[in-house]
Swiss-Prot record:
It is an enzyme of class 3 (hydrolase). Pfam families: Glyco_hydro_15 (PF00723), TREH_N (PF19291). It comes from Thermoplasma volcanium (strain ATCC 51530 / DSM 4299 / JCM 9571 / NBRC 15438 / GSS1). This is Trehalase. InterPro entries: 6-hairpin_glycosidase_sf, 6hp_glycosidase-like_sf, GH15-like, Trehalase-like_N. Optimum temperature is 60 degrees Celsius. GO terms for biological process: trehalose catabolic process. Catalyzes the hydrolysis of alpha,alpha-trehalose into two molecules of D-glucose. PANTHER family: GLUCAN 1,4-ALPHA-GLUCOSIDASE (PTHR31616:SF0), TREHALASE (PTHR31616). One of its GO terms (molecular function) is alpha,alpha-trehalase activity.
Length: 623
């Protein structure tokens, strides 16, 4: 690969954080978390040694650990030094893996190390609903605290706790979870607890196991072997990427994070492994993201294909198609399995730092979001451009979707931001309908497929004509959020990316100018809109918007600015290179569900595009 014209530095992620600074109001800050997973579920691991979120056995199961949503009622699995005075913490992943290491440091020396993982291997269909935690002391003896308190059905189902020869087992009518350890632990009310003195340079495993009724010796779980298998699995997967370009460490960390979010039994991906982490502290914008969104399909395929995972991208599309076929309709959101249990309910938790309500399930499943139809057609087109085969099954599906868009595009909807107000004629949804016809026509022509191209082109032209007439406001010289509105919408950043209008067109430049003036904060972060959406309170800056902005800058050939913005947002990643959905532009704190697939898809999409543009410019200069 040619050398890029500028030294694009890799980001140095991890650094020490004072133990007492990790929590605010009794809750670890969202950014002070890592996560581990096994392609069925994932656990958040805070820098203070707490696993404070985790659903077992699957992403969409009830959370066994949920203290991130209620520090008193929620469950957790904690290991930390008993005396945290003047203790600092570092946290990092073993290179090119999702094996997480947390180190507690005092007076410049490591005093305690935790290595956390969930077993995974190339034999993906073999499930290990287990959390393995390796505890190591160093040159001095150390007192540690172990505190294990799982909860069931968000505290509604009270477990029986029984001592086993090799640990303890929590059992309800429907579920069970055990903890196996060689440390001396005891029952303390509704939890298992231990203050343990570790001798210098000693170590031991603690394992949480879901769905068991009998425990074996800790050594029988072969944690060292499982750790090696898991390490090999992640490194083998990472090494199969073809990407070796700029910001490699950030791109690969995003890819590894994304890979965890796939649910292996069906191949579908959750938008995030968490529920109800707030978009504003104390606010009500708290949603469950443990589902698959149709509109994410195209992003996933484009991103994975761009760094060499074409097989995974194609497989994801077919898995998504399989789910749609079984359901016999296109819905906004799908469960990752066949449960179809998306009903939204409120649980009696105080919420992260008092952010209520705490929602489980997602009501957006019932909305009409017309842009999703364009997303699935563009996903198939993206797969085709990456070398995938559009067979008769896929093409028949495309024609069915296009027939639906032919009449749906004129309807009001809730659009990309899933407004819970009355449906409107959102410009973004119209443009996505236009983009669907654009992709379908291109596939028909490029692949020699039978299609009513003339009819499609006529409808596509009609959509564009209407959007230019009703969706562009001459007074403000910009496209607007919906017909008849003066409001601006950051989703309009995608107009050039979708090919609806050139990036240097005066109409888009006017739109971009308004977005920069009215929605941009801190020079590179963006609010989604200023429209009253019927919800109380504000929200943070939506990180995916920054990556769309960078794509626009690349299309406008403003490469220096694109690079500056990209490096600025990369510096906003946490100590592990992870992102949430949003960020508080004032404090820098993460907001929303974490880690967020869309944010990481943005990293993966933009870095290769910027490098390619820089290489082309250099080649042109040198020719």
């Amino acid at each position: 690969m040619k050398k890029i014209p500028h030294e694009l530095t890799h980001m140095a992620f991890h650094g020490l954080v004072k133990y007492s600074d990790i929590t605010v109001e009794g809750y670890p800050k969202i950014q002070y978390h890592g996560f581990i997973g096994n392609n069925r579920t994932a656990m958040l691991v805070a820098m203070n040694g707490y696993i404070d979120w985790g659903c077992l056995p699957n992403f969409n199961s009830n959370a066994v650990f949920s203290s991130i949503l209620d520090k008193n009622k929620g469950g957790y699995f904690a290991i930390f030094p008993s005396d945290t005075t003047d203790v600092y913490v570092d946290q990092y992943y073993k290179e090119m893996t999702n094996v997480l290491v947390t180190e507690f440091v005092k007076n410049g020396k490591i005093i305690l190390r935790l290595t956390d993982f969930m077993p995974d291997s190339e034999y993906g269909k073999i499930s290990f609903p287990e959390v393995h935690r390796f505890v190591e002391s160093f040159s001095e003896p150390i007192d540690i605290t172990i505190d294990f308190k799982p909860t069931f059905n968000y505290g509604q189902d009270k477990p029986i706790i029984e001592k086993d020869q090799h640990g303890f087992i929590f059992t309800t009518d429907k579920e069970s979870i055990g903890i196996s350890s060689e440390f001396p632990l005891r029952k303390n009310s509704d939890r298992i607890f231990g203050n343990v003195k570790m001798e210098p340079r000693s170590s031991s495993w603690i394992i949480a196991l879901y769905g068991i009724h009998h425990l074996f010796r800790t050594t029988d779980y072969k944690s060292y072997l499982r750790l090696q298998e898991t390490t090999d699995y992640w490194r083998k997967w990472a090494s199969s990427s073809s990407y070796a370009g700029a910001y490699h460490s950030m791109v690969m960390r995003s890819a590894l994070a994304l890979k965890v979010l796939f649910y292996e039994p069906t191949g579908l991906m959750v938008a995030a492994p968490t529920a109800s982490l707030p978009e504003a502290i104390g606010g009500e914008r708290n949603w469950d993201y443990r589902f698959t969104w149709i509109r994410d399909t195209a992003y996933v395929i484009e991103a994975l294909s761009s760094i060499g995972y074409k097989y995974e991208a194609t497989e994801f599309l077919y898995d998504m198609m399989d789910m749609i076929t079984r359901d016999n309709r296109i819905r906004t959101i799908y469960s990752i399995d066949d449960s179809n249990d998306l009903e939204e309910r409120i649980i009696d938790y105080e919420g992260y730092r008092g952010s209520r309500p705490v929602r489980i399930g997602n009501k957006a499943v019932d909305q009409l979001q017309i842009d999703q139809y364009g997303s699935i057609v563009r996903a198939i087109h993206s797969m085709a451009k990456a070398g995938g085969i559009v067979n008769s099954y896929l093409w028949d599906f495309v024609e069915q979707v296009m027939a639906k868009i032919e009449y749906l595009w004129k309807y009001p909807d809730s659009s990309i931001w899933e407004f819970r107000t009355e449906p409107k004629q959102y410009v973004y949804s119209k443009v996505m309908s236009w983009a669907a016809f654009d992709s379908a026509i291109s596939m028909a022509k490029d692949l020699g497929l039978s299609a009513p191209i003339k009819q499609w082109k006529s409808i596509q032209d009609e959509i564009k004509k209407e959007v230019l007439e009703k969706g562009f406001d001459t007074d403000t010289n910009s496209f607007v959020q919906y017909y008849g509105s003066k409001n601006i919408d950051a989703a309009l950043l995608r107009l050039p990316i979708l090919g609806f209008i050139p990036a240097n067109d005066e109409k888009f430049l006017g739109t971009l100018s308004r977005i920069e003036k009215e929605l941009m904060v801190d020079g590179y972060l963006f609010k989604r809109y200023r429209e009253d959406d019927g919800l109380k309170g504000d929200e943070g800056s939506f990180l995916m918007l920054t990556f769309w902005y960078i794509e626009d800058l690349i299309l406008m050939k403003r490469l220096k600015k694109a690079r500056e913005v990209l490096e600025s947002v990369l510096e906003k990643a946490n100590h592990l290179g992870l992102y949430s959905e949003e960020i508080d532009e004032k404090s820098g704190d993460f907001l929303g569900n974490f880690p967020q697939a869309l944010s990481h898809l943005g990293v993966i999409r933009v870095a290769p595009k910027l490098e390619e543009a820089l290489l082309k410019r250099t080649s042109k200069i040198n020719s």
